[in-house]
């Protein structure tokens, strides 16, 4: 899979995520709930203020961490002034 990305709504991005993005791009550590797997991803702010997970999102898809039709819950949390993300998959 090439160039996969996860995009968050403008209103959600502006309220909860964008303040953590330095410049238009920053790094984000993403972990999967219930596993020890973590993935380094790029967090990007688009021109219309949407936050997007880009580089690294493919790793999560390729690891088959979830299937089509699964519901993913994205739990953003601030730890020592750094944004981290834990993904919960509901099958």
UniProtKB/Swiss-Prot annotation:
Keyword Transcription: yes
Matching SUPFAM superfamilies: DNA-binding pseudobarrel domain
One of the Pfam families matching this protein, by short name: B3
GO cellular component: nucleus
Coiled-coil ranges from the UniProt annotation: none
Keywords assigned: DNA-binding, Nucleus, Transcription, Transcription regulation
A GO molecular function held by the record: DNA binding
InterPro entries the record matches: B3_DNA-bd, DNA-bd_pseudobarrel_sf
DNA-binding region: 1-91
Compartments it resides in: Nucleus
Official protein name in the record: B3 domain-containing protein Os03g0164300
Organism per entry: Oryza sativa subsp. japonica (Rice)
């Amino acid at each position: 899979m090439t160039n996969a990305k996860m995009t968050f709504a403008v209103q959600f991005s502006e309220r909860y995520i964008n303040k953590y993005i330095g410049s238009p791009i920053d790094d984000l550590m993403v972990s999967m709930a219930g596993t020890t797997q973590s993935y380094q991803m790029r967090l990007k702010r688009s021109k219309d203020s949407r936050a997007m997970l880009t580089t690294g999102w493919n790793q999560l898809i390729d690891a088959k961490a979830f299937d089509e039709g699964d519901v993913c819950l994205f739990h953003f949390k601030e730890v020592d002034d750094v944004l981290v993300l834990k993904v919960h998959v509901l099958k």
